Amino acid sequence: MKFAYAARDREVAFIIRLLTIFGVVEQRQMRLLFDHLSNRSYGQILARLRREGLAFFSPDGQFLATSRYSLDHGKTLESVMVFWAFIKMRDNVLDFCASDPPAILSFSSAAKDYDLISGSKQNIPAINAARTVVAEAIVRLIVVDDLSTLDEVEPRLVNDYGVLVGPNGVERIYKM
């Protein structure tokens, strides 16, 4: 099912839900995710969220967040990287929710369940510790901006993938 179809007429709720889970994303990412909206409709939604105190914009206008604190918590890069992976997978998403650490978000597709996990250096110990706790049927998508980071991850026998993200989105997905 196309994400645009699933989100139609519920864009405000989807944006609030996504911002609550991720904390902070780039404005261009959110615009790309909701590219089915006209510029006017999208602008009206953001203006409404800002007016109601549900969205905050960084001073340079690059980031969209749930609060000023979200911009300062130091995990902006992790959130942005994982959001690129969510955008890549959007048309496979049937439902999504916040996940238990080390994952940021879990989503279901028609065939499988997925965890989107930031592969930052600080998160590697938690990823390795959780490898035996997470069910084998769940696909772990470990999002990194440098392939060498994946060398530190202890992969499970099945269903572990590395997602390489660049400044403009997902560049490649690797089976681990």
Q: Model regions: which residues?
A:
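Short, charged/polar micro-motifs that form catalytic or ligand-binding hotspots
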Residues: 5, 20, 35
